[in-house]
Amino acid sequence: MKYTELKDKSIKELEELLHAKKAELFELRVKLKNMQLSNPNEIKKARRNIARINTAINAYYSSSVE
């Protein structure tokens, strides 16, 4: 997921996507602890996606304040 894809979405869509990605990260961490995760790099990708979504949300709020 790229930032350019995220900046065109509404704030409601971004918050829903953020909630879904956090749930996905939780599931990945549970799988990692249970030794069921075949690719631990997925956790890194999920964290980066969450950071991108948070950046888009913060950009939306900072642009609406001005």
Swiss-Prot record:
UniProt keyword Heme present: no
Q: Give this protein's Gene Ontology molecular function annotations.
A: structural constituent of ribosome
Pfam short name (any one): Ribosomal_L29
Instruction: Please give the coiled-coil regions recorded for this protein.
Output: none
Q: Name one GO biological process term.
A: translation
State the SUPFAM superfamilies in the record.
Answer: Ribosomal protein L29 (L29p)
What keywords does the record list, in alphabetical order?
Answer: Ribonucleoprotein, Ribosomal protein
What is one cellular component GO term in this UniProt entry? Answer: cytosolic large ribosomal subunit
In terms of HAMAP family, this protein maps to:
Ribosomal_uL29 (MF_00374)
Q: Which family does it belong to?
A: Belongs to the universal ribosomal protein uL29 family.
**NCBIfam families per UniProt:** L29
Q: What is this protein called?
A: Large ribosomal subunit protein uL29
Native source species:
Helicobacter pylori (strain J99 / ATCC 700824)
Gene behind the chain = rpmC
